[in-house]
């Protein structure tokens, strides 16, 4: 609001419009002086500050202003004023007086729809803090500070009162991330050395650079002009012959390129966390490119937002000659999928050397080469190479992490170069079903052997049971009935027959035991059976001796009884042999 409008309002309040309007707007005649001073202040806004303070430091007499807690000055009416003036204090709540510098765009309050008035009143004798504009929000990139001192430069020894050393204090209230006083000092010292360039990170003397650039915008000129952030890595030596292959456009190369770039970015993050370089603003703000120091091969890859019709071009450049690569086949090549044999390398040393042309071809092809491919040392068939030569490392692994060209397959004096067309991936080249079939077959053989062992044990148990039942039957058949022992002659006749029967069965029993021992061939079984047979023989020999003594005594009685008793013996043998059969 300009000064002319303020004067116009003052004239309206002083006219015949009524004291009510004046009281309603300004609360009393004393406000006229205030607004006249305000008009002067608005006109003299560009004048020097001391003049403004002198003009506003002398308010009209009879008026005392109280500064409320919110900075709004409430006028205090003197006792000489009327009661109507004191009653109009309720209407003064709509008048907001701002003390201090008023900036444009600040909220302005009006009363009852009237045009808002900015009141710039300087209160004398009262000093306020700096009310200048402050930056809104929190600067996340700004380093922390304690009382204006950067956090990494604060000396912990300068604190007189160290509350974390007090008994019962929780160290995590003062140090984050597991730091304590000593480790924090060491960390600050290391950060200072890194930022000053004094901290030297050891890097192996190799020259392989892998550049992974993220955030593709489609403009190759701008991408080339972007600054690159560098982090050093070590890479195993390359074992491939490298060249500049033509660009390959395939959807599989896009997918494998994205996964490889993701792996590279995750490994960079882990490396930064390990060496504490995540604090540097370059690594934190720029997605940038990553140069990996390795061998003399430079691999550049771009990953970002890809469209459906956009193809990824992978370029491999080499500074090394072919002879250097050929002489470096001592270590295995990097980035091979697990379980897949490197098809471009010679066979392992445990295989027989490749035969000459005069000898017969081997029955088993070398690992990684299909059956339709002629073995090394034999000339290939005339004409174009068979299609089985195509799925090599160039096609199956072309869009992987390294994308290096593979060596050609040497067969005799002819070397077949790899074709750059798409071909099946690594799992299709290696037939893993044979390995699983071998393991399954071996498990089946083991189960079959276990079943055979169980069957043998069952047969042995059955043989033992049969032998026991036979012995029981023999004892039952040869055991005398009460009717047999009617006379001494019959008792003698039975004992003589039992003696002959034992002698007859002894030979057959020994044969069966020998056959059983030869069939089982187990030490425990042999020991057990031999002890059983020995005890049986001892028992039988004792019985035979007792029978012979008894027979000698009976022979003295009568010769007639012997002759009479010798006749029914064959009959008894025939009758007893019939049920045995």
Swiss-Prot record:
Q: What's the domain of life for this entry?
A: Eukaryota
Coarse class of the primary localization is nucleus
In what ranges is there compositional bias, type Basic and acidic residues? 1-10, 32-42, 271-282, 439-479, 488-515
One Gene Ontology cellular component annotation? mRNA cleavage and polyadenylation specificity factor complex
Q: Which InterPro entries match?
A: Fip1_dom, Pre-mRNA_3'-end_processing_reg
Task: Return the similarity comment.
Answer: Belongs to the FIP1 family.
Sufficient for interaction with PAPOLA as annotated region, ranges: 1-110
Q: Which residues carry this modification: Phosphotyrosine?
A: 411
Q: Which GO terms describe its biological process?
A: mRNA processing; regulation of mRNA 3'-end processing
Q: What does this protein do?
A: Component of the cleavage and polyadenylation specificity factor (CPSF) complex that plays a key role in pre-mRNA 3'-end formation, recognizing the AAUAAA signal sequence and interacting with poly(A) polymerase and other factors to bring about cleavage and poly(A) addition. FIP1L1 contributes to poly(A) site recognition and stimulates poly(A) addition. Binds to U-rich RNA sequence elements surrounding the poly(A) site. May act to tether poly(A) polymerase to the CPSF complex.
Stretches with biased composition (Low complexity): 247-267
Q: What is this protein called?
A: Pre-mRNA 3'-end-processing factor FIP1
Q: Which GO terms describe its molecular function?
A: enzyme regulator activity; RNA binding
Positions of modified residues (Phosphothreonine): 481
What residue spans carry the region label Sufficient for interaction with CPSF4?
136-219
Q: Which residues carry this modification: Phosphoserine?
A: 84, 86, 88, 280, 479, 483, 487, 541
Q: Where is this region: Arg/Asp/Glu-rich domain?
A: 442-477
């Amino acid at each position: 609001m300009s000064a002319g409008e303020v004067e116009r309002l003052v004239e309206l309040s002083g006219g015949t419009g009524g004291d009510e309007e004046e009281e309603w707007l300004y609360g009393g005649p004393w406000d006229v002086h205030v607004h006249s001073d305000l008009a002067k202040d608005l006109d003299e806004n560009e004048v020097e500050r001391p003049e403004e303070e002198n003009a506003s430091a002398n308010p009209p007499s009879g008026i005392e202003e109280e500064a409320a807690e919110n900075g709004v000055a409430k006028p205090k009416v003197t006792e000489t004023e009327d009661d109507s003036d004191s009653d109009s204090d309720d209407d003064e709540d709509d008048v907001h007086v701002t003390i201090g510098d008023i900036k444009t765009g600040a909220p302005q309050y009006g009363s009852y729809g009237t045009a808002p008035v900015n009141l710039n009143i300087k209160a004398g004798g009262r000093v306020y803090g700096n009310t200048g504009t402050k930056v809104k929000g929190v600067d996340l990139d700004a380093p922390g500070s304690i009382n204006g001192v950067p956090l990494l430069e604060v000396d912990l020894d300068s604190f007189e009162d160290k509350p974390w050393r007090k008994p019962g204090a929780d160290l995590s209230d003062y140090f984050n991330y597991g730091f304590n006083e000593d480790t924090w000092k060491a960390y600050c010292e290391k950060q200072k050395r890194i930022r000053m360039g004094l901290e030297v990170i050891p890097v192996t003397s190799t020259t392989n650079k892998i550049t992974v650039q993220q955030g593709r915008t489609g403009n190759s000129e701008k991408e080339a002009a972007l600054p690159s952030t560098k982090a050093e890595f070590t890479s195993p030596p390359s074992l491939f012959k490298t060249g500049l292959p033509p660009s390959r456009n395939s959807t599989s190369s896009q997918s494998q390129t994205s996964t490889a770039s993701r792996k590279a970015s995750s490994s960079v993050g882990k490396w930064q966390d390990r060496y504490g370089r995540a604090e540097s603003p370059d690594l934190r703000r720029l997605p940038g490119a990553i140069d990996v120091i390795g061998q003399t091969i430079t691999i550049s890859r771009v990953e970002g937002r890809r469209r459906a019709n956009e193809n990824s071009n992978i370029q491999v450049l080499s500074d090394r000659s072919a002879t250097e690569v050929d002489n470096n086949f001592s270590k295995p090549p990097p980035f091979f999928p697990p379980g897949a044999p490197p098809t471009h390398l010679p066979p392992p040393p445990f295989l027989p050397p490749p035969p000459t042309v005069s000898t017969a071809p081997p029955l088993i092809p070398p690992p990684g080469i299909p059956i339709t491919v002629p073995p090394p040392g034999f000339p290939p068939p005339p004409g174009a190479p068979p299609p089985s030569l195509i799925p090599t490392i160039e096609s199956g692994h072309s869009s992987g992490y390294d994308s290096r060209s593979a060596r050609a397959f040497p067969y005799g004096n002819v070397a077949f170069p790899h074709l750059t067309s798409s071909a099946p991936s690594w799992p299709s080249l290696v037939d893993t079903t044979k390995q699983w079939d071998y393991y399954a077959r071996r498990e089946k053989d083991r189960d079959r052997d276990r079943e055979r062992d169980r069957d043998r044990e069952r047969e042995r148990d059955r043989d033992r049971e049969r032998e026991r039942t036979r012995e029981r039957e023999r004892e039952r058949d040869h055991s005398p009935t009460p009717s047999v022992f009617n006379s001494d002659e019959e008792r003698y006749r039975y004992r003589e027959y039992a003696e002959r029967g034992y002698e007859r069965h002894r030979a057959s029993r020994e044969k069966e035991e020998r056959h059983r021992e030869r069939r089982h061939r187990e030490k425990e079984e042999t020991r057990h059976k031999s002890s059983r047979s020995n005890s049986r023989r001892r028992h039988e020999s004792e019985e035979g001796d007792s029978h012979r003594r008894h027979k000698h005594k009976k022979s003295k009685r009568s010769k007639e009884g012997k002759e009479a008793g010798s006749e029914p013996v064959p009959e008894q043998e025939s009758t007893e042999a019939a049920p045995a059969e």
